[in-house]
């Protein structure tokens, strides 16, 4: 895909690319993104006023037609950090939710529950809290609170989760020095107090975090380290945990390994070398195609232009290299 830049409407001091980068249109300097609910976001300034936008919505608004006037932007591959225009689509809330479920991005837990009278006599069972609410007319949120032990009764009844469900949910091993949490081999963290799996957050470096409370003090901890400390032996006391496939959100034990700082750096360098084997196109200053190369290494050798400079242009971190425009070819 050829990288294209366009002005951002109402904020013409900025340009956005179809690969999800934003830069100052005058200096060419790329903006740094922060994280908001798992999405990249950035602040744009105009007349001394700042406004924060989700990057994927800006890309969609500028590069993707929306004839049906949908108000939701969907990431096709489920990766919220992949804001390439080819990975985005306008949709509605229903399709967005179905997409998440179909692709395993969101799981539906049908928590079977049982209804009892005040004396503990069995009345009925329901496949889910929502079904119980529809049948009895009782607020599902209140039923949920009763099942979680936050209230004794709801609507004049006692409610409990099915015991089989509870056993299935509470799998995994306890965290080191904190038995209130369980961690599974695939990186899910279960809170015994809340009786549910914790929803992870994504830090600025792309790692998944959860908030762990110890002695009433909350601390954000990387999930990959929790998995490694619980399941993977570390006889040499190595300080780093490496993602073997370089996917920072794949926290399965089969994808993690303890390593030294040097080993971690070597792995990082090896994965970066893949960048130099991607096909690249060369353009003049008017975006006319000059030629293409099988790799950035070849482009650098034949043109005499620094390879890292070509990479920076392809990534949108600078405008030109050797008075040429460059872009990756997918």
From Swiss-Prot:
Its EC number is 3.1.-.-. This is Uncharacterized HNH endonuclease L245. Signal peptide: none annotated. SUPFAM superfamilies: DNA-binding domain of intron-encoded endonucleases, His-Me finger endonucleases. One of its GO terms (molecular function) is endonuclease activity. Pfam families: HNH_3, NUMOD1, NUMOD4. InterPro entries: His-Me_finger_sf, HNH_nuc, Intron_nuc_1_rpt, NUMOD1, NUMOD4, WH-like_DNA-bd_sf. Keywords: Endonuclease, Hydrolase, Nuclease. It comes from Acanthamoeba polyphaga mimivirus. Coiled coil: none annotated. SMART domains: HNHc, IENR1.
């Amino acid at each position: 895909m050829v990288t294209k830049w366009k002005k951002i409407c109402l904020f013409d001091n900025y340009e956005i690319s179809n690969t999800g980068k934003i830069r100052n249109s005058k200096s060419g300097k790329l903006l740094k993104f922060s994280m908001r609910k798992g999405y990249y976001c950035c602040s744009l300034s105009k007349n001394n006023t700042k406004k924060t936008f989700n990057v994927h919505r800006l890309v969609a608004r500028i590069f993707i037609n929306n004839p049906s006037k949908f108000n939701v932007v969907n990431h096709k591959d489920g990766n919220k950090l992949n804001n390439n225009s080819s990975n985005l689509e306008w949709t509605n809330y229903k399709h967005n939710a179905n997409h998440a479920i179909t692709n395993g991005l969101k799981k539906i837990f049908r928590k079977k529950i049982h209804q009892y009278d005040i004396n503990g006599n069995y009345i009925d069972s329901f496949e889910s809290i929502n079904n119980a609410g529809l049948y009895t007319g009782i607020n599902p949120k209140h039923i949920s609170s009763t099942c979680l032990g936050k209230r004794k009764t709801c609507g004049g009844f006692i409610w409990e989760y099915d015991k089989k469900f509870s056993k299935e949910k509470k799998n995994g091993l306890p965290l080191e020095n904190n038995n209130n949490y369980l961690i599974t081999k695939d990186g899910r963290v279960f809170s015994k107090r809340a009786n549910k799996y914790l929803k992870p957050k994504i830090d600025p470096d792309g790692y998944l975090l959860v908030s762990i409370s110890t002695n009433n003090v909350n601390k954000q901890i990387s999930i990959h380290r929790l998995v490694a400390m619980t399941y993977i032996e570390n006889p040499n006391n190595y300080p780093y945990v490496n993602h073997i496939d370089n996917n920072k959100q794949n926290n399965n034990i089969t994808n993690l390994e303890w390593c030294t700082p040097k080993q971690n750096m070597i792995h990082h360098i090896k994965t970066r070398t893949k960048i130099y084997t991607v096909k690249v196109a060369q353009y003049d200053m008017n975006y006319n195609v000059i030629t293409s190369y099988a790799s950035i290494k070849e482009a650098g050798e034949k043109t005499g232009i620094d390879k890292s400079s070509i990479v920076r242009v392809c990534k949108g971190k600078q405008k030109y290299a050797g008075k040429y425009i460059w872009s990756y070819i997918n």
